[in-house]
Structures are given as C-alpha cells and as structure tokens.
Amino acid sequence: MNIRLEEEKDYFEVENLTREAFWNVYRPGCFEHLVIHNLRKEKCFVKDLDFVIELDGKIIANIVYAKANLRLKNGKEREVLIFGPVSVLPEYQKKGYGEKLIKFTMNRAKEMGFNEILITGNPNYYKKYGFESASKYNIFYEGVPEDSEFPCFMICILNKEKYDILGGIYSDPKCYDIDGAKLEEFDKKFPYKIKEKRAGQLQL
C-alpha cells in the first residue's frame, strides 16, 4: 500500500473511482466526481493535501481538501480547512483504507500549519478522528438557526492551544457548487450506469 499525492495522470482514474464510490449512495447517480474535477482548477483547492492510496499499482482511494472562509462574529473572515469527497472503491470499503487516508492527511494538514478542519458528516463515525459539534464552539452552518441542533456539522481543532476563534458562520465554498446540465454532459465521459432511487438516499 502506498499513500502518495495525486498526479495529473491520475485525474480520470480518480474521478472514475469517486463516481463508483458514490453512485446511487446519497441520490440517484452522483455528482462528487464533478466536484473533484472542478475543484482542482480553483484557488481554494489544497493541492498538497490531494492524496491517493495505491495498491498493487491501482488507485483505490482519494481525499481532497479545500480552503473555506469562516465569517467571524467580529465581522472579519478566517481561513479554515475542509475535506471531501473521501472516496474508496466499493470493493475496498470497510477495510480501513479511508481511515488511513483521513488520519494521514489530517496529520499532514497540522504539519502545514492548519488548525481547524470543518466538515459535514456522520458524527458517530468522525468523532474517532477528534471531530466535535461545531456549535460547541459557537460556529454555525449558514442557513441553520443557531438555536437548532445540527450535529452533522463538525469541527476538529488540531492544536487547541492555538485555537482562538470566538464564533462564526460557515458557508460552503462556491467551488463545490454543481450545475446539473454540466453534470449530465460530464457524465458522458464515463461508462454508462443506471441511476436508481434507493431507500436511505438523502435526495430521491
């Protein structure tokens, strides 16, 4: 197993594995492969945290990071880190590869001087990496009332001795926005797959 930075020659393979990992999971089809494709061209993209896992010459997992702005209570902005998508080929899921990639890159982010990582995800899963509800630190997701619980929005503080944010509002970077028509066109580059409605999807 080799954890290394993604290279330009890997782009299509990584986009395809991301598509395989997310297809019909949260909605019929998926858009995460286009997110990655678009993200690489954006200023918010953190190239030095774009890692893959290679196994026997095959890329089986990928993680990408981006920088986002947190609007502080005092009106200023603070740069924070976010990650995702985290993609693992279906046949390699639940074998610890995603966990290895997340831990490796979080340590690398700390070495690079980043201190706060914000994500949305399953709190029961991400708490093992040190993530806590962001509302505990008076940080809230844009559009969600501050007095309502949103446990899926979490923060990991990599070095609490350096933490000095008194509260703020987070919004996703525009580089994560997806245009439906562009997604349909982009999907034509990949092998045909059937979009299915499944129980448990977030969008039906």
Language-model segment annotations:
Residues 160-204:
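Acidic/histidine-enriched, glycine/proline-rich intrinsically disordered or flexible terminal extensions
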Residues 111-114, 121-148:
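Conserved active-site alpha-helix within GNAT-family acetyltransferase domains
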Residues 49, 53, 84-87, 114, ...:
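Internal, conserved structured core segments that host functional sites
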Residues 15, 22-70:
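Active-site rim helix/loop that mediates acceptor-substrate recognition in acyltransferases
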Residues 2-14:
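A short beta-loop-alpha structural element at the N-terminal edge
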Residues 48, 149-154:
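Short hydrophobic/aromatic beta-strand or adjacent loop that forms the aromatic wall/cage
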Residues 75-90:
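Conserved acetyl-CoA binding element of GNAT-fold acetyltransferases
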